[in-house]
Amino acid sequence: MILFDYKLLAALAAVVEQGGFERAAQALGLSQSAVSQRIKLLEARVGQPVLVRETPPHPTDLGRRLLNHVQQVRLLEGDLQRWVPNLDEGGAPERLRIALNADSLATWWAAAVGDFCAERRVLLDLVVEDQEVGLKRMRAGEVAGCVCGSARPVAGARSLLLGAMRYRGLASPDFIARHFPRGVEAAALAGVPAIVFGPDDLLQHRFLKDLGVEGGFIHHLCPSSEGFVRLTAGGLGWGLVPERQVQGELARGELVELLPGQVIDVPLYWHYWRNGGELLASLTEHLLARAGDGLVRVSG
């Protein structure tokens, strides 16, 4: 039976979470060579590589399994410290590393978890990923939980439907007047600038496809949820924006719908480790109770 040295596993987790050996060393209060040595010792112990040494480093299949183990051990240790307070020498708040999409972070997330974090003295380490790809962080064992658009959980985890984020195709009045003086035509949307969050953002593609428009389209790239709204309101392009995020802009007429009533509802799921302990289970209950206040209720 292998008994792991958790200092070695902590080094692996730090390298992956911090995106490199130098930052991992700073986070752990060690030299970079010491972190590298711990990774080498871990690889010698398990008999195979645990990291692919690229920029940034990422875990091998075995490395992902070890990171999954680390995440669950951290959560279970937190449970034990609550039952045996003397084990928690520093009395420091617990930290949860969570992956979620930028639009959730910009809209409903803070209201949904604020009370929980204050009452339970929890610090969040948030990793922003598009809702289409956030689950890769769970699969890699980098996070304790994840909000994403996929219903299927990774091995060892569960998923629960939180609700749906409602998106509307919007643009500024000036943009519409400039490009569509006789009214918005679906077929012409591909020929005017759109705004896309990043290469994994397929909402604009889906919007056009729902309208029967196939093929590519010209677009700006803007990897910021708040910046996306500002660019849209500034007349640089059209885009799919969370309805909840722009209620003020819609009320003031700074943004208008391209095609009124044409919406896309994106289901969002909460993924969490089955053996994640009481803290993660409590957060899950809290999210199920509160997330619906900021999302559209859907069956599922």
From Swiss-Prot:
A Pfam family this chain is assigned to: LysR_substrate
Single GO BP term: regulation of DNA-templated transcription
Domain HTH lysR-type positions: 4-60
Entry-linked InterPro entries: ArgP, ArgP_gammaproteobact, LTTR, LysR_subst-bd, Tscrpt_reg_HTH_LysR, WH-like_DNA-bd_sf, WH_DNA-bd_sf
Family: Belongs to the LysR transcriptional regulatory family.
SUPFAM superfamilies: Periplasmic binding protein-like II, Winged helix' DNA-binding domain
Example of a GO MF term: sequence-specific DNA binding
Annotation: DNA-binding region: 21-40
Keyword Cell wall biogenesis/degradation: no
Biological role stated in the UniProt entry: Controls the transcription of genes involved in arginine and lysine metabolism.
Gene encoding the protein: argP
Organism the protein comes from: Pseudomonas aeruginosa (strain ATCC 15692 / DSM 22644 / CIP 104116 / JCM 14847 / LMG 12228 / 1C / PRS 101 / PAO1)
Protein keywords: DNA-binding, Transcription, Transcription regulation
Subunit structure of this chain's protein: Homodimer.
The protein's name in its UniProt record: HTH-type transcriptional regulator ArgP
Gene3D superfamilies: 3.40.190.290, Winged helix-like DNA-binding domain superfamily/Winged helix DNA-binding domain (1.10.10.10)
